Amino acid sequence: MSAQRFLFLLVVTSLIAASLAAPKDVQLTKRGTPCWCGKTVGIYWFALYSCPGGHGYTGHCGQFMGVCCYPADP
């Protein structure tokens, strides 16, 4: 019984620690890697097939398992 209680407390503690460690600011969570569409430098988005809205992207090109999005004025 004490082993089950210990595992339960371990899971609850890890969930609390993970939620407290998660950054709330979008700029902290956005760690884009540079990519190139021809000679234009953009930001690579993994597992997306089109650019996300609200970031000012005007063009994109397909990359391996994602998309490279670039703004109007790079």
From Swiss-Prot:
One Pfam short name: Defensin_4
Cellular component per GO, a single term: extracellular region
Keyword Secreted: yes
Propeptide: 22-29
Keywords: Cleavage on pair of basic residues, Disulfide bond, Ion channel impairing toxin, Nematocyst, Neurotoxin, Potassium channel impairing toxin, Secreted, Signal, Toxin, Voltage-gated potassium channel impairing toxin
Cleavable signal peptide: 1-21
Cited InterPro entries: BDS_K_chnl_tox, Myo_ane_neurotoxin_sf
Primary localization: secreted
Disulfide bridges in this chain: 35-68, 37-61, 51-69
Protein localization: Secreted; Nematocyst
Entries under Gene3D superfamilies matching the protein: Anthopleurin-A (2.20.20.10)
One Gene Ontology term of the molecular function aspect: ion channel inhibitor activity
Other known facts: Negative results: does not show effect on crabs.
Family label: Belongs to the sea anemone type 3 (BDS) potassium channel toxin family.
Function: Potently and selectively inhibits voltage-gated potassium channels Kv11/KCNH/ERG. Acts as a gating-modifier toxin that shifts the voltage-dependence of ERG activation in the positive direction and suppresses its current amplitudes elicited by strong depolarizing pulses that maximally activate the channels.
Name by which UniProt lists this protein: U-actitoxin-Bgr3a
Source organism of the structure: Bunodosoma granuliferum (Red warty sea anemone)
Lineage of the species this protein comes from: Eukaryota, Metazoa, Cnidaria, Anthozoa, Hexacorallia
